[in-house]
Amino acid sequence: MVEVKKHKFPGVYIVIDDDGSEKIATKNLVPGQRVYGERVIKWEGEEYRIWNPHRSKLGAAIMNGLKNFPIKPGKSVLYLGIASGTTASHVSDVIGWEGKIFGIEFSPRVLRELVPIVEDRKNIVPILGDATKPEEYRALVPKVDVIFEDVAQPTQAKILIDNAEVYLKKGGYGMIAVKSRSIDVTKEPEQVFREVEKELSEYFEVIERLNLEPYEKDHALFVVRKT
């Protein structure tokens, strides 16, 4: 017998499987829609999508005991590197119809994969753009509550800072998935993470840093706040 209960983060749920193992899930905003072949659970008349931590760095962070999750119902999110929408679809479930995701993606081919998803998920606005040039999409993106970044670039930290400068509300939060090998393959991941933390701390208050193993190798997730 599968059971669903609320997670400590609003909009996130815990699914207790037949074998007693726990998984995380979000309540499907668009019942019947699957985004990346995820498992769907029906429970008390609602549909829940299992959030696969092997396919989503944010999912991995929650599974690893993330303490700060500023993405909440009704919030606006600038998502840098939205790709084909795997993680964004769960964020869309969490923020609900009152919330909004502005998703920046550099690759037209990848963005095209997002189109069928957003036809039903009107709280996602896909934008073709370059996250290293935040002024490019100024006409399309308002001030937001949260910026989430998943861009495998050497200048990852600078990208978050530059976008926060333009789009993040005062007191708003940034979340960044850092892949150490994208920044410097010659350094130990721990050294790269320390350098990223130092760079972020010059602009933000760094609230949390979390390793994403075993789901993602050489990755960490940082949560920061704009003061």
From Swiss-Prot:
InterPro entries membership: Fibrillarin (IPR000692), Fibrillarin_CS (IPR020813), SAM-dependent_MTases_sf (IPR029063)
GO MF annotation terms: histone H2AQ104 methyltransferase activity; RNA binding; rRNA methyltransferase activity
Entry EC no(s): 2.1.1.-
Amino acids binding S-adenosyl-L-methionine: T86, T87, E105, F106, D130, A131, D150, V151, A152, Q153
SMART domains from the UniProt entry: Fibrillarin
UniProt keyword terms in alphabetical order: Methyltransferase, RNA-binding, rRNA processing, Transferase, tRNA processing
One biological process term in Gene Ontology: box C/D sno(s)RNA 3'-end processing
Top-tier EC class: transferase
Keyword tRNA processing: yes
Highest taxon in the source lineage: Archaea
NCBIfam families tied to this protein: PRK04266.1-2 (NF003276), PRK04266.1-3 (NF003277)
Protein family according to the UniProt entry: Belongs to the methyltransferase superfamily. Fibrillarin family.
Protein name: Fibrillarin-like rRNA/tRNA 2'-O-methyltransferase
Native organism: Pyrococcus abyssi (strain GE5 / Orsay)
